[in-house]
């Protein structure tokens, strides 16, 4: 789930927001705007403090709704994991931006797929094929090899928004549920904290080239968030590890 907080919407706008309304949240700057969230309203709260109104929307990303559906299907002997995964996604009309497995497991006795679609896919992709299963709040789904990231050629430098580092390395687990990343890895590594001016292109498992006075190289986003407000700067914070 994602939480969107907006201040001082008009009374008419507040009254018109309903559960199940579609939500598309764009962010960026003049001439460079992109989407960071697509979903629907599943929770809504308006609160008044003096003359200010705060509206808090709980938004279910569109991919989560589809992946929450139930499946009950049995696949024949010697079925391949890749074929099963593609078929499961096709049943519900899910488009996958990338689908590559570390190990394409074969099931000599066939395989029963029963339960929540996301749970079934996680069992196959992560537990059995030792791969990554990534869903993004924009609705994109990626299935990648364990060591692969999603490389769209993003480079961050001080000239295009990279902010000075204020923290040293901190110990965090590589495997994280934040931002809907699930990996087949079970290990801890040092991650590097960095931030930049809000950048809609930064997302879980994105490969980023960093060029700065104290850090140079290619890194993968382990987790992160976009945040800001009327009294603070709009920033994207990231936990990175070398790629």
Question: What do these predicted regions represent?
Answer:
Residues 1-14, 18, 147-148, 154-243:
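An acidic/polar, Gly/Ser/Thr-rich interaction patch typically located in mid-to-C-terminal regions
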Residues 52-63, 95-172:
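Short beta-strand-centered interaction patches in the first periplasmic/extracellular domains
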Residues 35-40, 56, 72, 218-220, ...:
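Well-ordered beta-strand positions in beta-sheet-rich domains
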Residues 9, 52-68, 233-243:
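Short solvent-exposed strand/turn elements
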Residues 1-58, 230:
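Assembly/oligomerization scaffold segments
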Residues 81-97:
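Glycine-rich, acidic and aromatic/proline-enriched surface loops and short helix-turn segments
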Residues 69-78, 107-111:
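Second-shell loop/turn segments in exported
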């Amino acid at each position: 789930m994602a939480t969107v907080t907006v201040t001082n919407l008009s009374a008419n706008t507040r009254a018109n927001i309903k559960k199940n309304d579609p939500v598309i949240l764009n962010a960026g700057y003049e001439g460079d705007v992109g989407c960071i969230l697509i979903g629907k309203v599943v929770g809504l709260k308006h609160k008044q403090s003096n003359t200010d109104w705060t509206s808090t929307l709980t938004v279910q990303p569109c991919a989560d709704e589809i992946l929450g559906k139930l499946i009950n299907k049995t696949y024949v002997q010697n079925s391949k994991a890749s074929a099963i995964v593609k078929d499961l996604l096709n049943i519900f009309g899910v488009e996958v931006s990338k689908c590559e497995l570390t190990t394409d497991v074969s099931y000599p006795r066939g395989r029963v797929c029963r339960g929540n679609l996301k749970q079934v896919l996680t069992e196959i992709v992560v537990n059995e094929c030792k791969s990554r299963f990534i869903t993004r709040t924009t609705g994109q789904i990626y299935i990648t090899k364990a060591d692969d990231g999603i490389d769209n050629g993003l480079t961050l430098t001080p000239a295009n928004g990279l902010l000075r580092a204020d923290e040293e390395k901190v110990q965090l687990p590589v495997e994280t549920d934040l931002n809907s990343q699930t990996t087949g890895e079970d290990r801890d590594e040092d991650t590097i904290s960095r931030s930049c001016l809000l950048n809609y292109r930064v997302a879980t498992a994105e490969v980023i080239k960093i060029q700065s006075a104290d850090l140079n190289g290619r890194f993968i986003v382990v987790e992160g968030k976009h945040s800001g407000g009327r009294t603070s700067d709009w920033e994207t914070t990231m936990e990175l590890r070398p790629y």
